[in-house]
Amino acid sequence: MNPSEMQRKGPPRRWCLQVYPTAPKRQRPSRTGHDDDGGFVEKKRGKCGEKQERSNCYCVCVERSRHRRLHFVMC
């Protein structure tokens, strides 16, 4: 096979690793902008419109494609 035959058809796959702070589900605030310990939580929207909360813990997002994502929460 020559190199031109080995090329994939379609858009290239993009692998991306994003690390951003987020509150675990059990600690998500009932009051907007505050967590249960009185700290401030910043909310924003991701690339695909998902909600991301920033706090003292970390969430690792492994992006496989534009619409498929794997989320791992580490605290």
Curated annotation (Swiss-Prot):
Q: What does the UniProt entry say about where the protein is found?
A: Nucleus
* Highest taxon of source: Eukaryota
Which residues does the annotated region (Disordered) include? Answer: 21-43
Q: List the biased-composition ranges (Basic and acidic residues).
A: 32-43
Alphabetically ordered keywords of this record: ERV, Nucleus, Transposable element
The misc remark on file is:
Protein expressed at very low level.
Q: What does it do?
A: May possess a function in tumorigenesis.
Protein name from the UniProt record: Endogenous retrovirus group K member 10 Np9 protein
Organism (species): Homo sapiens (Human)
